[in-house]
């Protein structure tokens, strides 16, 4: 126990030396004073994916329809609360859309910080997205993009809450909360097979996410062009991180929605040229059993 405490002190001292003094307004808030809980929860998340897949390997997939319905509804409602509260609190604080520093809005800044804590905490709750994929044996959904996005967001927002918990930080979560209302509504509806025919708009969610990232980068860099006292290093780091998401999500979009029609056309031509469907190879390397 003493060794763990010593390690915790060393990690926190290292972070304080790297980023400077923490924002005193968030001292004592749940999970924020020490990085260790966030780090341990992230490692637990990654181990759960690996061990969960091994555990489920020879077991039937679980349905979880009822749990998923409640979960998606809860995340949708939380996202709606954060969206409304961020709009109201930033309006109350008289936030400047181009650049907003950390300490000019008084109680408005504290109100924004409280909502952003819920945003940070929601990233922990969203680890369940992956756990549900594991239990339902949807391993094709557990991509590098999925895991990287979930794990990194939780850790980055721990840093944001400790050093830049308001001001310019409000914009990305405002957009993301709106996107998550759409996303988790979609996920909730997709649990029911009878609703699948109405869910043709999935690819537009990815497009909306890409637009969200570009707008967030633009908003972040606007504070570089016309500074207002918000930490310059944080602006550059946030822009760089968002660029990694743009690259990964754009690659996902191209692989999922741009290359599939080409493959489909090729398969149709092969059938027309006299090749039976049983000889076609599908994406996972298995033959189309329905055609055999």
Curated annotation (Swiss-Prot):
It catalyses: a very-long-chain acyl-CoA + malonyl-CoA + H(+) = a very-long-chain 3-oxoacyl-CoA + CO2 + CoA; (5Z,8Z,11Z,14Z)-eicosatetraenoyl-CoA + malonyl-CoA + H(+) = (7Z,10Z,13Z,16Z)-3-oxodocosatetraenoyl-CoA + CO2 + CoA; (7Z,10Z,13Z,16Z)-docosatetraenoyl-CoA + malonyl-CoA + H(+) = (9Z,12Z,15Z,18Z)-3-oxotetracosatetraenoyl-CoA + CO2 + CoA; (5Z,8Z,11Z,14Z,17Z)-eicosapentaenoyl-CoA + malonyl-CoA + H(+) = 3-oxo-(7Z,10Z,13Z,16Z,19Z)-docosapentaenoyl-CoA + CO2 + CoA. Its EC number is 2.3.1.199. InterPro entries: ELO_CS, ELO_fam, ELOVL2. Belongs to the ELO family. ELOVL2 subfamily. The C-terminal di-lysine motif may confer endoplasmic reticulum localization. Interacts with TECR. This is Very long chain fatty acid elongase 2. It comes from Mus musculus (Mouse). The gene is Elovl2.
